[in-house]
Amino acid sequence: MRSMLRWAALMGVGLLITGCAAQPLAPQVEEVVITQTPGSAETPAPQAGPITLYYPEGASQGDAAYALTYDLPVFSGTEPAVSAMNAAIEGWREELLDRVESERLPLADRAEGADLPGTQVTSLCVEAETPLGNFTSVLFYESDWYENENGATQRISTLVFDEAGLECNLAAASGVYDPLPLAAQQVWNIMSMDPSAYYGDLTIADVSESLDLYNGFSVAEEGYTLYVQPGILAADESNGRPLEFSFGRNALYPDFVGDLITVEEYEALLPQLFALASHCGPGFQSWQGEAFDPPEAFTHGFRLDSAALQGEALILRGQLIQGAPGELEATEVAVAQLTLTREQGGGWQLASLTLS
C-alpha cells in the first residue's frame, strides 16, 4: 500500500534517518554470501549479502531451471520509521518472488550444459535533505536473462520514504499537487535535445503515460530523477537499460519563482505555507499575521497560480487545497490570496491570507 508524506516531519516531528545500516536477513534461502559495503548518500545500500534461490523449489545449481539472486537493504534500529521501511522492502521482496515464479520461471527452458537463466537484483540507497524534509530513496535494479536472448534486460523500481518511514509519491516529495504535466514537460524538454535517440512519433501524452510517479522516481538534494523502462521511449531497441531523466526541484515550482521571488526565498517559505494552510483551512478563516501554534500534521496546502508586485508587497493567488500533496482526495476548497512583505534582511515573509 502506498502511503503519502506525513507533513508533521517538516515541523521537527519525526525521525531523521542518517545512513542505511545493514542487518542480516533471516536465513531462509539455500545460499547466502555475506559482503558488507560501507553506506553513503549515493552508493549501493548496505545489505546482508547476495542471496540466491534456485527454481523449482528444492533444486540445486546443477539441476535448476532458473536462479534468483538479490541484494536488498535492511535498515537498522527500532524506531517506527525504520520498521516501516523494512516492512515496505519486505513487501517488495515478496512481490519479486511472485513475479519470478509466475512470469519468469515459465519462460525458462535450460538446455543441458547451457548457462542458468535467472534474475539478479541489486539496490542503491540515496538520502536527500530538501526544503520539505528528508527523504530516503531505495532503487531496485532488476536484470533477467535467458539462453536464447542477447544480453540482459534491466528494469528499475523505487521506494521513496519520508522521515516517518512512509512511502511517498512525487507529489508528496515535491509538495506539488499535480506534478505529472510538469514532470512530463521536463522529460520532453530533455528528449528534444537529442530527438534521434527516441521514437520519432512520440507525443508528450506518450511521455506522460510512460512515467511512474509512485515507484519510478528518486529524490536527490539537487532535484528528482524519473525512470522509464526500456523499449518505451528509446529508439535503440538493443539497449535493455532504463532511461533516466533528471531535473532540479525548481522545475516543478510555479512560473513566477525565479522571476518575482528567488528559488531560495520560495523554498524558505514552503513549510510556512503548508503550516498556514493547515491552520486556516479547517475553519476557512482568513489570517492577518497573528501568531499561531504550528499544526502537528499538514492537512491543507496551496496551489499557487500567479503572482504580482503591488508596491512593496508580493501578492500570490491560487487555491486552498484540502489534503496534502500526494493524497488522492485532495480537493480545491477556496480561492486564496496571500500577501508577502519584505523582511529587514531582504527576504519575503507572510503578512496575510484572504480566503473566498
Describe the residue ranges of each PLM region.
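C-terminal motif of bacterial Sec signal peptides marking the signal peptidase cleavage site
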Residues: 16-19
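Compositionally biased intrinsically disordered regions enriched in Thr/Gly
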Residues: 21-250, 258, 282, 287-312, ...
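Glycine-centered tight-turn and secondary-structure capping sites
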Residues: 177, 254-283
